[in-house]
C-alpha cells in the first residue's frame, strides 16, 4: 500500500505561497496530517565577472531578522520559464545583464514541507543593463 491523500484543505493563500493541510493514510494504515507550503518555484543566479568576482547582494530578511549576503534570486511568475525568470531577476537585483547562462543545478529547497523547486544558473559576460 502506498501513502494516499484522504483530504486536503487550504489553510492560507498568500501573495506567493499557499499553505495546505493534507490528511494522509500511511502505508501501515496510520492516519496523519502534513502541512505543506506550495510554492511556484524560484531561480538563483551566480553572476560572475570576468575577473572571477561573484556579485552578492546584502538584504534584510524578516524571517531571520537580519541582513545577509546572498546571490540574486527570485520567484518564477506563472507561465514564465526558469531561464526567463533568471534573466529578469539579474537585471532587477543587480543592474547587470549576462551574455551566457549555464544551468548548474535544480533541487527542492525543503522537500519535507515545501514544493519549491530551485533552478540555479551561472551568469557570465556581465554588462550594465542600462
Tell me the role of every PLM-derived stretch:
Residues 53-54, 101, 118-119:
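Conserved active-site beta-strand-loop modules that form the wall/rim of enzyme catalytic pockets
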Residues 80-84, 93-100:
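Beta-rich strand-turn-strand
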Amino acid at each position: 500500500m502506498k501513502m494516499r491523500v484522504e483530504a486536503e484543505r487550504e489553510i492560507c493563500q498568500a501573495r506567493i505561497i499557499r499553505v495546505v493541510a493534507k490528511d494522509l493514510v500511511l502505508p501501515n494504515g496510520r492516519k496523519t496530517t502534513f502541512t505543506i507550503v506550495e510554492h511556484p518555484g524560484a531561480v538563483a543566479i551566480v553572476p560572475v565577472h570576468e575577473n572571477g568576482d561573484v556579485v552578492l547582494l546584502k538584504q534584510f530578511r524578516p524571517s531571520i531578522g537580519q541582513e545577509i549576503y546572498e546571490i540574486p534570486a527570485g520567484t518564477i511568475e506563472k507561465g514564465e520559464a526558469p531561464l526567463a525568470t533568471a534573466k529578469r531577476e539579474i537585471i532587477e537585483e543587480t543592474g547587470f545583464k549576462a551574455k551566457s547562462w549555464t544551468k548548474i543545478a535544480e533541487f527542492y529547497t525543503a522537500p519535507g514541507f515545501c514544493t519549491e523547486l530551485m533552478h540555479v544558473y551561472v551568469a557570465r559576460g556581465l554588462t550594465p543593463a542600462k
